[in-house]
Amino acid sequence: RAESPISSGYHFGSRIVIKDNFLYASIGERGQGMIAQDITNHPGSIIRIHLDGSIPQDNPKFTIKPKWLPEVIQIGVRNPQGMYLSPFDDEVYISNHGAKGGDFFGRVEFGGNYGWKIIGWGGTNYIGTKIGDGTAWKANFTKPLWTWTPSIAPSNILIYNGDLYPEWKGDVLVTSLKYKTLYKLNFKNNEVSSQNIIFEDLIGRIRDIEVNSKGELFLINSNSNASLWKMSKE
């Protein structure tokens, strides 16, 4: 069970990934800010458990972070709504909402700390004040691979490995709620070099993206009458 129970309608995180018979889950900080640095709580973390619910004995608590909760493998995230297992390097990647700016794409790092709310990845509080001392990133924290300021509100990610768009293989597709946009991050050799807009403001606020065995892409929006869309190559 997620601890501690928090009465809040904000920042749930929400994604689950299965890798090597382990379950990874992204947990938002529920709008509580510095709780993401509290190693005795789940909010603001990435957890890793066996599929039967038991705790892997090689998690950080048993190796490098003895004070952490046993199921937690990374802390310091705000609202990680996107998560994907790369078919290329077998690493787990996330997208995370910042506050007013500071959204990011990054890798799940064993025993790592993304730094929320000591740092804000280039964003500010909604009233315009600094997050921490205003530094976008500090040494000893996990560094995002790509950030967005202003925010795009990234809702999910997909690392493309299909045949329909061969030129996109290995790149990251990012769905945006705020700008109703599908972005593509050009991702090679563990680095993002640039981004492209595939389309914008066509289907509403984009909530999720999936790919089938043919490489065809499907998207769902989060409008009041949420609908499923198939992307055309035309």
Question: Predicted segment positions?
Answer:
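Asp-box/WD-like beta-propeller blade repeats and closely related beta-sheet repeat scaffolds
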Residues: 1-18
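Conserved catalytic network of the ASCE P-loop NTPase/AAA+ motor domain
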Residues: 211
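Short, exposed beta-strand-loop hairpins at the edges of beta-sheets
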Residues: 217-222
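Short loop/turn motifs that cap or connect beta-strands within the blades
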Residues: 1-4, 61, 198-200
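Repeated scaffold domains used in trafficking and secretory/extracellular systems
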Residues: 206-208
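Short, solvent-exposed coil/turn segments at beta-strand boundaries
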Residues: 20, 214-215
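Beta-propeller domain segments
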Residues: 29-196, 204, 214, 226, ...
